[in-house]
Amino acid sequence: MPYLHRSLRPQPQPVPGDARTIHSSGQSFEQLRQGCLQSGTLFEDADFPASNVSLFYSERPQVPFVWKRPGEIVEKPEFILGGATRTDICQGELGDCWLLAAIASLTLNQKALTRVVPQDQGFGSGYAGIFHFQFWQHSEWLDVVIDDRLPTFKDRLVFLHSADHNEFWSALLEKAYAKLNGSYEALKGGSAIEAMEDFTGGVAENFQIREAPEDFFEILEKALKRGSLLGCSIDTLNASESEARTSLGLIKGHAYTVTGLDQVNFHGQRIKLIRVRNPWGQVEWNGPWSDSSPEWRSVDLEEQKRLGHTALDDGEFWMAFKDFKIHFDKVEICNLTPDALEDSALHRWEVTIHQGSWVRGSTAGGCRNFLDTFWTNPQIKLSLTERDEGQEGCTFLAALMQKDRRRLKRFGANMLTIGYAIYQCPDKDGHLSRDFFRYHASLARSKTFINLREVSERFQLPPGDYILIPSTFEPHQEADFCLRIFSEKRAVTRDLDENIDIDLPELPKPTPQEEETEEEQQFRALFQRVAGEDMEVSAEELEYVLNAVLQKKTALKFKRLSLLSCRNIISLMDTSGNGKLEFEEFRVFWDKLKHWMDLFLQFDVDKSGTMSSYELRTALKAAGFQLGGHLLQLIVLRYADEDLQLDFDDYLNCLVRLENASRVFQSLSVKNKDFIHLNINEFISLTMNI
């Protein structure tokens, strides 16, 4: 696959209405639907076929599933029946309670729900077996188109379904989300906050309940009023505890939805209550304030009605907030915008987005524990210029998300352990070196490195310039990431890898023969013996000359220069264009080669005859090539071996091609030093010659 440059520059916050359709046909939902209506056919989605490939990638169904359209399951199917509510969500035979908890939370915010579940579809007029749903993914909204064939067994939906068997919006939403992530199996296991963010483009904040602030009830209450999506769960100590039921009816390792908070009068006291929903649609808390507990007998009937108290086993229940804090461990809040939950006033936050990659051998440096490679990670400069209203510092929230890991599960990819550190920026600009991190500690960091899709943290720092370094915990781990910076006042962010600066010295003029050094005279004799009277060598002859000379350099450990390197050298130095190298051209190159050899020996730290690819950035800069992260990634992919090492031949080949490309660009960019204009013939000619 050809390389496509992915910019790390800040991206604008996307407009939710501008969703991009990702169907392989290139057509929008409406175009596809109209095509089906005109042809009188029901839509069949070739991108997500009604077969096992869309169900599982590592197993097979234990019973034969039959894909059926809603009209083949019930007589009168409805898309949404009586409004989309949290009771429309009942878990099936798939371990995606985290997704169902997020959908239940989504139903509490009508505006967000309408965006994810467009209302321009149904089983009435205009029905063509096609539906669409919108999800946020890494800075943009995607419109996911599906057909309405659903997996069934004995005419019952196998996976997510509504309590009313005629209603299908929730089952179709689950299918669209499965398509987005590659299969239904990809939805097994997760955190509710992941789907909440995909439903809103919001930003997550996580609370360990035992460490929560004193006003935690008010924080949650305010979050619900602002339309935030809330989930909660109970931790497990080991895998055997997953979905184990406690004596009070709670399920460990299971995702619940927080659907309400309130207070009631009880024996002259105001009791704080929290309403929680189990996406199974059954199995509830059976302690104080549960559906049939005696506490409700002391509550006025009007008050019970206001709270929606029922004794149905529908998976939703009230419990005292003090009991909630004892029995639950974690609360996840997805803020539609990261409004400060501790303040009563709403704020409009500024948002910048950076897309980047950790690439093994060049930008996958790991955390600060790995000093030798940590500095090679992407570095984002953050300039905080304005203090918050009435505050001494500047508030911002940094959210680091690893991309597409769920979609890549079928290929063995798991969530990586990620986090970030923030440093005071020194006066000088440019990518910070290893020595900086050797002598400077971070000012702030994510609380922990953790294997979640996103790590987010709120900070308040004095005005100034800072460097934020996102990384995996271990080095050499590859992933794409999305970094979002939310700030109360305008903040300027810039990627430090973007600056490319190439400093090429002027080519020296030929030295008169009578002024040649003893070494040059020896070269002339060897050159003349190989080249003959015309004093020009071919690539094969140059290979012989250079290897004969370099084999005598005992400090330089390498097998031999390749013919490819010699061809590239001639391409760089051949001014006549005859494919051969004259002696004067060779002498100029020899001066370069001596300098490049000295650099190689300097960065061959263990004197093994190879250089670590992580040292390449510094070595190239010393040779006059300050390159951005994406170029370094390309170079490492091309020249480093599987152990992330470059031998001298690879190193030399890289430098020769870099200088050749740079000099060609300089010769063509006469009017504008940043751009050149080429037609297809010129472009291909150049690429074949570099």
From Swiss-Prot:
<feature type="active site">
    <location>
        <position position="97"/>
    </location>
</feature>
<dbReference type="InterPro" id="IPR022684">
    <property type="entry name" value="Calpain_cysteine_protease"/>
</dbReference>
<dbReference type="GO" id="GO:0004198">
    <property type="term" value="F:calcium-dependent cysteine-type endopeptidase activity"/>
</dbReference>
<feature type="binding site">
    <location>
        <position position="167"/>
    </location>
    <ligand>
        <name>Ca(2+) 1</name>
    </ligand>
</feature>
<dbReference type="InterPro" id="IPR022683">
    <property type="entry name" value="Calpain_III"/>
</dbReference>
<feature type="active site">
    <location>
        <position position="278"/>
    </location>
</feature>
<feature type="binding site">
    <location>
        <position position="291"/>
    </location>
    <ligand>
        <name>Ca(2+) 2</name>
    </ligand>
</feature>
<keyword id="KW-0479">Metal-binding</keyword>
<feature type="domain" description="EF-hand 3">
    <location>
        <begin position="591"/>
        <end position="626"/>
    </location>
</feature>
<feature type="binding site">
    <location>
        <position position="284"/>
    </location>
    <ligand>
        <name>Ca(2+) 2</name>
    </ligand>
</feature>
<keyword id="KW-0677">Repeat</keyword>
<feature type="binding site">
    <location>
        <position position="312"/>
    </location>
    <ligand>
        <name>Ca(2+) 2</name>
    </ligand>
</feature>
<keyword id="KW-0378">Hydrolase</keyword>
<feature type="binding site">
    <location>
        <position position="314"/>
    </location>
    <ligand>
        <name>Ca(2+) 2</name>
    </ligand>
</feature>
<feature type="binding site">
    <location>
        <position position="316"/>
    </location>
    <ligand>
        <name>Ca(2+) 2</name>
    </ligand>
</feature>
<feature type="binding site">
    <location>
        <position position="606"/>
    </location>
    <ligand>
        <name>Ca(2+) 4</name>
    </ligand>
</feature>
<dbReference type="InterPro" id="IPR002048">
    <property type="entry name" value="EF_hand_dom"/>
</dbReference>
<feature type="binding site">
    <location>
        <position position="610"/>
    </location>
    <ligand>
        <name>Ca(2+) 4</name>
    </ligand>
</feature>
<dbReference type="GO" id="GO:0005737">
    <property type="term" value="C:cytoplasm"/>
</dbReference>
<feature type="domain" description="Calpain catalytic">
    <location>
        <begin position="42"/>
        <end position="337"/>
    </location>
</feature>
<keyword id="KW-0106">Calcium</keyword>
<feature type="binding site">
    <location>
        <position position="81"/>
    </location>
    <ligand>
        <name>Ca(2+) 1</name>
    </ligand>
</feature>
<keyword id="KW-0788">Thiol protease</keyword>
<dbReference type="GO" id="GO:0006508">
    <property type="term" value="P:proteolysis"/>
</dbReference>
<keyword id="KW-0645">Protease</keyword>
<protein>
    <recommendedName>
        <fullName>Calpain-9</fullName>
        <ecNumber>3.4.22.-</ecNumber>
    </recommendedName>
</protein>
<dbReference type="Pfam" id="PF00648">
    <property type="entry name" value="Peptidase_C2"/>
</dbReference>
<feature type="binding site">
    <location>
        <position position="574"/>
    </location>
    <ligand>
        <name>Ca(2+) 3</name>
    </ligand>
</feature>
<feature type="binding site">
    <location>
        <position position="88"/>
    </location>
    <ligand>
        <name>Ca(2+) 1</name>
    </ligand>
</feature>
<feature type="region of interest" description="Domain IV">
    <location>
        <begin position="522"/>
        <end position="690"/>
    </location>
</feature>
<dbReference type="GO" id="GO:0005509">
    <property type="term" value="F:calcium ion binding"/>
</dbReference>
<feature type="binding site">
    <location>
        <position position="576"/>
    </location>
    <ligand>
        <name>Ca(2+) 3</name>
    </ligand>
</feature>
<comment type="similarity">
    <text>Belongs to the peptidase C2 family.</text>
</comment>
<feature type="binding site">
    <location>
        <position position="608"/>
    </location>
    <ligand>
        <name>Ca(2+) 4</name>
    </ligand>
</feature>
<feature type="active site">
    <location>
        <position position="254"/>
    </location>
</feature>
<dbReference type="InterPro" id="IPR001300">
    <property type="entry name" value="Peptidase_C2_calpain_cat"/>
</dbReference>
<comment type="function">
    <text>Calcium-regulated non-lysosomal thiol-protease.</text>
</comment>
<dbReference type="InterPro" id="IPR036213">
    <property type="entry name" value="Calpain_III_sf"/>
</dbReference>
<dbReference type="InterPro" id="IPR022682">
    <property type="entry name" value="Calpain_domain_III"/>
</dbReference>
<feature type="binding site">
    <location>
        <position position="604"/>
    </location>
    <ligand>
        <name>Ca(2+) 4</name>
    </ligand>
</feature>
<dbReference type="InterPro" id="IPR011992">
    <property type="entry name" value="EF-hand-dom_pair"/>
</dbReference>
<dbReference type="Pfam" id="PF01067">
    <property type="entry name" value="Calpain_III"/>
</dbReference>
